[in-house]
Amino acid sequence: TSPFNDRSLTQLDSVTVFATAMMIRIKKGLDVPISGKPEQLVHVAKPVRHVGVLGVDHVDLKPAMLVAEGDKVKLGQALFEHKKLPGVCITAPGAGTVRAIHRGAQRLLQSVVIRLDDTEDEETFASYPVDQLASLTDTQVVDNLLASGLWVALRARPYSKIADPTTRPAAIFVTAMDSNPLAADPVPLITAEAESFGHGLTVLSRLGTMPLWVCKSPTAELPLPQGLSHVRQASFEGPHPAGLPGTHIHFLEPVDVNKVVWHLNYQEVIAIGKLFTSGRLSTTRIVALGGPHVKQPRLLQTRLGACIEELI
């Protein structure tokens, strides 16, 4: 386990600024030497029969359940609403039957498990022509993200809670790099979905005029949409935790009690791009399978919420 976490402070070596691009070099940190690094080729994983939503993935979650065990649900159907954030719902990552709702001490929600059907019924959402994405209103963006459940991809710092849709941050950070040990290299994954990644950034830029930081490694050449003046690039070089959003935020837009920023992962940006152009919720995700006990360390293309026991 890495001794550094996402809130670690690192020592800055140097900063180089090129207009809307910035290079930050970090010299203190640690690249944890763990064997079993995944081959950076994507393999299609075997199908799973169960998907789920974990309560631990959502800090300070207070759910108001909208389904019960035994209910049939569609992909994208709301499972529960966040009591502290009215209108923010977590939606089903697959179509099927709610097999279990697990709760812990003080009725803390642990998980909602769905057994998938052979045919996947799905909710559909608003979609827009590509040439209209750059003119969407703030309301159109927020409403579609809330309806689909993709709003929960936006996390607010400090505390990493789900972002409040009634507020706006000082900046939004897209994490397009990963310095965690055994992590997948985001660059080929983003390149393979270049169009959707660009569409997702365009949609996020419509949430306001705050800086939209795309944080990447120095060698990464990412497909960014043209004509968006507040989309900025920052390159981070150095050992772990150079690739974590907490590090990026610390150097670019430090937060405090009165200053909040939002962040999200590059795969969620791709999913947002697909949502707004197709009206469908994309559940495709790439995960890294690695470590000293893995016989074939590799990247797996699977689905959101996949049961790990069935996956491997």
Question: What do these predicted regions represent?
Answer:
Residues 17-66, 233-236:
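N-terminal, Lys/Arg-enriched amphipathic/low-complexity engagement segments
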Residues 61, 67, 84-87, 296:
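Short, solvent-exposed loop/turn positions at domain surfaces
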Residues 87-95:
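Short coil-to-beta-strand transition motifs
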